[in-house]
Amino acid sequence: MISNFNLSYSLKHVSSCFIFSDNNDPINKLINSLNSNLNLKVRLPSDYNLLADEFLPPNQSVLIDFKDIDDNWFSKAKHLPSLFSNRRSPYFPTLAQKHILESLKTVPVYTIVNDLNEIVIASPRDLTNFNSFNWVKRFYNDWFIWEKDEGNVNIGLFFMNREDAELYLHQICLKDPRGVENVGVNVKTISLDTFYKLNRLSPPRLQFKLIADLQEIKNILNVNSNSRVSFHPKQKYDKNWFKGIPIFIYSPTVTNLDWTLKSNKNMIFFQEMMHIMFQKIY
């Protein structure tokens, strides 16, 4: 069982070293744009996974302008601040979400942390000097105007595959060895419920993304692999992309009476190989 401990996130440490040279990777393209000192525009999928960016025509994408919050200091407040509910997910966790959190405690995911056990965040460079006036303006925007993220956002990445997280760490070390030496960074294993909480409860302009096991996506999109699995009717995918994190479900049937008598619940796997092995056993 994965131990569940408290993690914090920091916008200070190793926030300017996320600049990669591989422009063919859509994730790297996004991070490059976030770290640019130019007012760039980035095309993101509207209702598809970020990894599908390379395969979508322009009319299926949304053009996002990376700019600071509205300079209109006299914007009318849209709501009153609440000290008793979260701004991103006011009703989290519901009863159903509590059950999900409990189930996710045994699922490992990986992220990059510093020596203070703070999650390393990729932050955009501010286009203007962040003085006390800008701080007050942003505070007002966050508490009285903010309804969803627009413009610059900070991103914390989690990975289903440890090797992908280690590759990400390696790129960080290559681009900013001095910063890494000062704060220390390493791959941390945590439980998936921690990511779920951060994803739902993060403050304005801070988002946590879960990166799928890229090898698993490659496997399920392979022609030979497709013969072993069937896709859910609502799953969005094509021959070159797959939305979200692949989850494999084994449903007990009457052909295996012993198993059916023991449990009528579906078994869920995050790796196709484990799913196949389970099918062979039962």
Curated annotation (Swiss-Prot):
It is found in: Plastid, Chloroplast. InterPro entries: Tic22-like. Gene3D superfamilies: 3.40.1350.100. Keywords: Chloroplast, Plastid. The keyword Disulfide bond does not apply. One of its GO terms (cellular component) is chloroplast. Its main location: plastid. One of its GO terms (biological process) is protein transport. Belongs to the ycf80 family. PANTHER family: PROTEIN TIC 22, CHLOROPLASTIC (PTHR33926:SF4). This is Uncharacterized protein ycf80. The lineage of its organism: Eukaryota, Cryptophyceae, Pyrenomonadales, Geminigeraceae, Guillardia. The gene is ycf80.
